[in-house]
Regions:
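N-terminal secretory signal peptides that target proteins for export/translocation
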Residues: 1-6
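Bacterial N-terminal signal peptides
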Residues: 11-20
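Sec/Tat signal peptide C-region and signal peptidase I cleavage site
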Residues: 21-27
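Electrostatic cytochrome c docking/interface patches
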Residues: 29-59
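Sequence context surrounding c-type heme c attachment/ligation sites in exported
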Residues: 54-61, 96-100, 121, 138-139
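Electron-transfer interface patches adjacent to heme c in soluble/periplasmic c-type cytochromes
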Residues: 86-100, 116-126
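C-terminal capping alpha-helices of c-type cytochrome domains
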Residues: 105-112, 118-139
């Protein structure tokens, strides 16, 4: 009987340990994007112009501002109710991403960040939105 209890305790402790490590690893990688290599060097095919930036600004106001805020700091009215941190588009970390990486993130989404393929179905509109996001650098 004692041998059974020891085995049961050992198995229980092992399961608890595995669960604890998986929770820690999941928490550490929650904000990590797995971006395919082709997007890391992908260039924006839409020429930057007053029109593309203005169109991007309109799309931002409609689809992004509620979470990312007026200035793109990640402090929009919906941000406080989310259990994740919204990206700060003015940050060096965000601005260091390639246009292709940003395009992938907004197109595919992850977790609380929705995919914008259906909400902004035209690729060129999403590329124009990236031009607008670039105007937020260092604000």
């Amino acid at each position: 009987m004692k041998s059974f209890q020891i085995r049961l305790m050992t198995i229980s402790m092992g399961m608890l340990l595995v669960f604890s490590f998986s929770t820690i690893i999941q928490a550490q990688t929650a904000g990590v994007w797995n971006i395919p290599a082709k997007y890391k060097t992908m260039k924006n095919p839409v020429a930057k112009s007053k029109e593309s930036v203005a169109n991007g600004k309109d799309l931002y106001a409609k689809h992004c501002k509620s979470c990312h805020g007026t200035a793109g700091l990640g402090d929009g009215p919906k941000a406080a109710s989310l259990d994740v941190t919204c990206s700060d588009f003015s940050s060096k970390k965000f601005q260091a991403l390639s246009d292709g990486e940003i395009f992938f993130q907004m197109s595919e989404g992850k977790g609380k960040m929705p995919s914008f393929k259906k909400l902004i179905p035209e690729d060129n509109d999403r590329w124009g939105l990236i031009h607008y996001l670039r105007t937020m650098a260092g604000k």
